[in-house]
Amino acid sequence: MNLIYKLVKSNSFLFKMVYYLRLLAFPLFIRLTWRINNTIENNALYSSIDKDIRGCNNYIKIGIKSRIYGLKIYVRGKNNKVIIGNNCVIGKKCSFWIEGDNNTIIVGDSCTFTHTVHLCAQEYGSSINLGEDCMLSNNIIIRTSDSHPIFNSDRERINEAKTVWIAKHVWIAPQTTVMKGVTIGEGAILASNSVITK
């Protein structure tokens, strides 16, 4: 090994070659190890899904007879889950966005999304849980985080991520935003252009 090292070091061409190969190989190694053991179970009747997943031990499951017409799944982190139930219909320009570790997005059986629905679970251990038979119209945002920290005068963070619970048979009208920590009861109807914070 020392002989090879001396040879490479004495020859400027070989030295540059090894140097540049290491620069290329290291990011490749990171990319390969950063995508270990991600599992996707797609049982959909029809699916058009764009997946951008970086991390390890992430799990995506799409239920039986679901129809997905234009969903982007973006994951950055590890041990995250996206579970779409059976008989769901997800329209075009929808996105599920996860950043952080141990986050979950669960869509119950027979849910329908019209189009442009954005579900965002961020930070650590937060989740979005939609019960069965929920109807989401267009331009809906549901999120578990503010996407940035806020600190008080004692430098303590005051806006941690919180789980969102939406019970079954909920209808969410257009242009509605559901913020972190919200619980919505069974059979509720959220009016157009609402911002739900509690």
Write out the residue ranges for each language-model feature:
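Terminal amphipathic alpha-helical/low-complexity segments used for targeting or macromolecular assembly
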Residues: M1-D50, C56-Y59, K65, D133, ...
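Short, recurring structural edge motifs at helix starts
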Residues: S48-D52, L71-Y74
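Short, hydrophobic/aromatic alpha-helical segments in well-folded domains
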Residues: P174, A191-S192
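Short, intrinsically disordered, charge-balanced linker/junction segments flanking boundaries
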Residues: G85, S194-K198
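Flexible, glycine/small-residue-enriched loop-and-beta-strand segment within the central core
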Residues: K61-V182
